[in-house]
Regions:
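Phosphate/NTP-binding elements of NTP-utilizing enzymes
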Residues: 2-202
Length: 202
């Protein structure tokens, strides 16, 4: 697999190319700022923004960019609902299948290839898929990842009461057990309540 051109080692440029592939306007300054933070921010980061800013699409693009740079990485995508996590991984798979620059990542016949979990072609055999999606209240034991993407883990129907918020917080604590040494956690979301989970993480 040929390495990416040096210019595309800056995720912001890769995002611009992806947006053009999707026939979207070039990324806004806010979107480019999110892209820079994804690449250079702390190992544990929270990205909060209004609906429609494109947090999930930008981060999905970030996942394929990192896999193109290093196909041995493992990602776990966690959302409030399994459907939302699956939507994230489905969009990620579509980018891999549709962008010529990402064609070296298309899974081979003997590899996992579903919206629940998939491998990228150059990945070595491993118990953990390249990308796996699941609901935040699901069973995470046994999962391993270099980076956890927590995409809208907090929504009104799982954070309305204090016991619900406590249960959610306990699930989020499991992320540490999943991470490989030096791993990263990225939270994407919008606070839903005054005692938001995101406020306790800051």
């Amino acid at each position: 697999m040929q390495p990416l051109p040096k210019k595309l080692h800056d995720f912001r440029y890769f995002l611009i190319i992806t947006w053009r592939h999707l026939n979207l306007p070039d990324p806004t300054p806010v979107q480019l700022e999110i892209a820079e933070y994804l690449q250079h921010g702390e190992r544990r980061k929270i990205i909060q923004g209004f609906r429609g800013v494109g947090k999930s699409w930008i981060t999905s693009t970030y996942v394929v960019w990192r896999l193109r740079m290093n196909p041995q990485l493992k990602f776990l995508v966690v959302s409030a609902s399994k459907d939302r996590a699956d939507n994230f991984s489905t969009f990620t798979m579509r980018l891999i299948n549709e962008m010529p620059l990402l064609s070296p990542l298309i899974p081979q016949d003997h590899q996992r290839n579903s919206k629940i979990s998939f491998d990228v072609a150059p990945a070595s055999a491993d118990h953990a898929p390249s990308v796996k999606s699941q609901g935040v209240l699901g069973q995470m034991a046994g999962s391993r990842a270099d980076e956890v993407i927590a995409d809208d883990c907090e929504v009104p129907n799982n954070s309305f009461t204090q016991p619900m918020r406590d249960k959610l917080a306990e699930s989020v604590k499991e992320f540490d057990a999943i991470l490989k040494p030096g791993g990263k956690i990225t939270f994407l979301g919008t606070p839903q309540v005054e005692n938001s989970l995101y406020l306790t993480l800051e």
